[in-house]
Amino acid sequence: MTNIQKTHPLMKIVNNAFIDLPTPSNISSWWNFGSLLGICLILQILTGLFLAMHYTADTTTAFSSVTHICRDVNYGWIIRYMHANGASMFFICLFMHVGRGLYYGSYAYTETWNIGVILLFATMATAFMGYVLPWGQMSFWGATVITNLLSAIPYIGTNLVEWIWGGFSVDKATLTRFFAFHFIFPFIIAALAMVHLLFLHETGSNNPTGISSDADKIPFHPYYTIKDILGALLLILALMILVLFSPDLLGDPDNYTPANPLNTPPHIKPEWYFLFAYAILRSIPNKLGGVLALVLSILILVLMPLLHTSKQRSMMFRPISQCLFWILVADLLTLTWIGGQPVEHPYIIIGQLASIMYFLLILVLMPMASTIENNLLKW
């Protein structure tokens, strides 16, 4: 009797990706974040779909419709807070996933890595547009400030901003198009995630040692399916603790005030997951320079395969690089803290030093450390 799992065109794809996939036997919990990101994406699409059923993308009713969801729709409050805090969990998983890739040299799979960077940009764009939809004070002013950054582009900047706004300020046209894009983007992300997996399965997974694991592979199911289920349960536990005990912990109180173009909030700041990039943007006194630094702070990931000078792929056996990696993590945490602080002494200088340190670590210190470690191997 033929096994449908291995003959049916659709089942064959599922089988080769999630069941009979040969997987390294030594991948740690840092390899769980890929599946967790998939779960986050599905959760966001489902909660988002139900929110879209009750939301109205109009400047006069957007804020009221979100209030209506929380007060009048059955379980609307939990759907709304799962969606808002689900985005935070999504970014926590994203940062862990990227960090894992940097530490263990997963960027050596250049196609997979580059698709991953595109996925990161797409997710950030989606989250930004989603933040505008409740049409609170921080939604409106966040949209105004961030879209305005494009006016720093020489010659076409101003026209570009007005084209995105659909007018001369952030208004109804902007909200409507942001809702349309926010709805479609997660499906584009899902398609890109499939391409990401397609490229990954061309080479197979990396592992903590960074050396070939062809000699020691195990089937994905049941070993890693059960491991992924454990990860998923912990993710959902963390999300539900956040949603049910302190749903507004990561939000901004200003967003509970309806958008008012005549009143600027004292401190305009994005959601916590953008603060590191926002701090880099603010540390440069020039507008165009700041925008370039902002884009480069994430685009720099594309250069990782080129900046890899070590003879070893993973950082597992490279103590100097390990030390620099954790300094980079601390630096990003510092930038995140600075991004949420007002623009005044001493925060300005701390932010500038942390921004310089960020680029210095990635572009200079880490490649140098790798070269030193290569030479130490000869002794």
From Swiss-Prot:
Note describing how the cofactor binds: Binds 2 heme b groups non-covalently.
Keyword line: Electron transport, Heme, Iron, Membrane, Metal-binding, Mitochondrion, Mitochondrion inner membrane, Respiratory chain, Transmembrane, Transmembrane helix, Transport, Ubiquinone
Single GO MF descriptor: metal ion binding
Chain positions recorded as heme b b562 binding sites: 83, 182
Binding site for a ubiquinone: 201
GO biological process: mitochondrial electron transport, ubiquinol to cytochrome c
Residues annotated to bind heme b b566: 97, 196
Bilayer topology term: Multi-pass membrane protein
Places the protein is found: Mitochondrion inner membrane
Residues annotated as transmembrane: 33-53, 77-98, 113-133, 178-198, 226-246, 288-308, 320-340, 347-367
Cofactors that this protein relies on: heme b
Miscellaneous comment in the UniProt entry for this protein: Heme 1 (or BL or b562) is low-potential and absorbs at about 562 nm, and heme 2 (or BH or b566) is high-potential and absorbs at about 566 nm.
Quaternary structure note: The cytochrome bc1 complex contains 11 subunits: 3 respiratory subunits (MT-CYB, CYC1 and UQCRFS1), 2 core proteins (UQCRC1 and UQCRC2) and 6 low-molecular weight proteins (UQCRH/QCR6, UQCRB/QCR7, UQCRQ/QCR8, UQCR10/QCR9, UQCR11/QCR10 and a cleavage product of UQCRFS1). This cytochrome bc1 complex then forms a dimer.
The name this protein goes by in its record: Cytochrome b
Native species: Cephalophus spadix
Lineage: Eukaryota, Metazoa, Chordata, Craniata, Vertebrata
Recorded name of the encoding gene: MT-CYB
